[in-house]
Amino acid sequence: MQYSEIMVRHGELSTKGKNRMRFINKLKRNIQEVLSPFPNIKVRSDRDRTHVFLNGTPYEPVAEALKNVFGIQAFNPVYKLEKNVDLLIASVQEIMKDLYVDGMTFKISSKRSDHHFELDSRDLNLVLGNAVFDVLPNIKAQMKKPDVNLKVEIRDEAAYISHEEIKGAGGLPVGTSGKGMLMLSGGIDSPVAGYLALKRGVEIEAVHFASPPYTSPGALKKAQDLTRKLTKFGGNIQFIEVPFTEIQEEIKDKAPEAYLMTLTRRFMMRITDAIRASRSGLVIVNGESLGQVASQTLESMQAINAVTATPVIRPVVTMDKLEIIELAEKIDTFSISIQPFEDCCTIFAPDRPKTNPKLKNVEEYEKRFDIDGLVQRAVKGIKITEIKPEAEADDVDLMLDALL
């Protein structure tokens, strides 16, 4: 027998009261986007659960995709049948014969919401249990923690059988907590920060600074590939490429070397904040980890943060590098992040950056720049691409990647 659909149980949505259906509908849209590589799938939601109709699509890759979607507590692949006792008996026997191994224990758990059905839950348990013994006389029934708990649900529209429950990713549906701008460099930390923001329901748009010809097309593709990895947790993500060459050249020409990084990061923060304001964002998200590099000391963070009143979320700020790497490996971004393409944070990096920059000094150096003009030109020149989930790359894609 082939699974006909997957029943999805919602996560923290049960706590959301009057907003429950808004959360459920957002989760439905996220599931549809994540499963977009499977064109035959249909998704429908009600207050209790979301139904993913397979329509002939193989179950296994769909289940792998659903495991990552935030807002899902658990899901069950199910067989959908007509409400006919003889059909239920034959189906239960076939399922159990396929599952059976020596020494297996089982339990039938029936639930009837259609009270017009000819058998109540207790009688249905008895009839189906006896049917299993008829074809598997050596199997044993066990009420507590059986090897197989075969769940049979009689609803108004159909009968459903399931025996497997898969744990979901938990968290909140992406987009239910508002929108944030993720400052995505291409390193290890910022994709992990994006993942953690997504988990708490923040819809992210990835802001990436490019400085051609100093940064290569490979660096841009790397950032887009990282963004695509993040789409599996909640659907499509807008990728915003910011032209940053003019600003970096001005900073290099006009500022003391020790302050290059601080000034660069302040410009990045200004530009990200301007993009946020124009796109209805509420926060900025970045991958800063306290003390990891010179621009991530408390003094540096204070000097950089001073250009905006917008909240800046730093999900990995207290994590050790090894903890961040472990998460990067879990979400499958690590191997992309370590590809040897320089980003705009490294191309002009000074040998001895200032670890405790003084705000008054930074502001004095910035008088040498047309800050408003530089920021406006950068924002005006942004390119926006919608990054969507994709099926696994084929051999041709892998060969092309290897050539870059």
UniProtKB/Swiss-Prot annotation:
Q: Which Pfam families match?
A: ThiI, ThiI_fer, THUMP
Q: Any keyword Amino-acid biosynthesis?
A: no
| GO CC, any one term | cytosol
Q: Which domain of life is it from?
A: Bacteria
Which GO BP terms apply? Answer: thiamine biosynthetic process; thiamine diphosphate biosynthetic process; thiazole biosynthetic process; tRNA 4-thiouridine biosynthesis
Q: Which UniProt keywords apply?
A: ATP-binding, Cytoplasm, Nucleotide-binding, RNA-binding, Thiamine biosynthesis, Transferase, tRNA-binding
**Residues binding ATP, per UniProt:** M183, L184, H208, F209, R265, G287, Q296
- Molecular functions (GO terms): ATP binding; CCA tRNA nucleotidyltransferase activity; tRNA binding; tRNA-uracil-4 sulfurtransferase activity
**Per the record's keyword annotation, is Metal-binding included, yes or no?**
no
What is its subcellular localisation?
Cytoplasm
Q: In which pathway does it act?
A: Cofactor biosynthesis; thiamine diphosphate biosynthesis
- In this protein, which residues make up the domain named THUMP? 60-165
Chief localization class? cytoplasm
- EC main class here is transferase
Which reactions is this enzyme annotated as catalysing?
[ThiI sulfur-carrier protein]-S-sulfanyl-L-cysteine + a uridine in tRNA + 2 reduced [2Fe-2S]-[ferredoxin] + ATP + H(+) = [ThiI sulfur-carrier protein]-L-cysteine + a 4-thiouridine in tRNA + 2 oxidized [2Fe-2S]-[ferredoxin] + AMP + diphosphate; [ThiS sulfur-carrier protein]-C-terminal Gly-Gly-AMP + S-sulfanyl-L-cysteinyl-[cysteine desulfurase] + AH2 = [ThiS sulfur-carrier protein]-C-terminal-Gly-aminoethanethioate + L-cysteinyl-[cysteine desulfurase] + A + AMP + 2 H(+)
Which Enzyme Commission numbers does its entry carry? 2.8.1.4
Explain the purpose of this protein. Catalyzes the ATP-dependent transfer of a sulfur to tRNA to produce 4-thiouridine in position 8 of tRNAs, which functions as a near-UV photosensor. Also catalyzes the transfer of sulfur to the sulfur carrier protein ThiS, forming ThiS-thiocarboxylate. This is a step in the synthesis of thiazole, in the thiamine biosynthesis pathway. The sulfur is donated as persulfide by IscS.
Family membership noted in the UniProt record: Belongs to the ThiI family.
Q: What is this protein called?
A: Probable tRNA sulfurtransferase
Which species does this protein come from? Streptococcus uberis (strain ATCC BAA-854 / 0140J)
